[in-house]
UniProtKB/Swiss-Prot annotation:
GO molecular function: nucleic acid binding
Transmembrane portions of the chain: none
Record SUPFAM superfamilies: Restriction endonuclease-like
Pfam families the UniProt entry points to: UPF0102
Similarity-based family: Belongs to the UPF0102 family.
InterPro entries the UniProt entry points to: Restrct_endonuc-II-like, tRNA_endonuc-like_dom_sf, UPF0102_YraN-like
Protein's name in the database: UPF0102 protein HPSH_02690
Amino acid sequence: MRFLNNKHRAKGLKAEEEACEFLKTLGFEMVERNFFSKFGEIDIIALKKGVLHFIEVKSGENFDPIYAITPSKLKKMIKTIRCYFSQKDPNSDFCIDALIVKNGKFELLENITF
């Protein structure tokens, strides 16, 4: 696991906080934030219309943050989701989403795959 410096981590936390507020305006209910497993972390777990959304938040100003979500990152997310379901209701419908924050604008990409 890569350790982030305090400035980088603070920017990430701010982006996640803003992302939660944005998601609430779209009708999402926050279930959990920063769920950790030995495989990785899920930034936001939210519920909308009975579907759990596992959301990776990526932010950036000088590059397109979507490129930070690689096939390797998605595989780690899937393993982490399996860990989540081993502790919670394994019968929930779910999808993996990305929330891109760039220059103060938000873009939700639902049901991403590789």
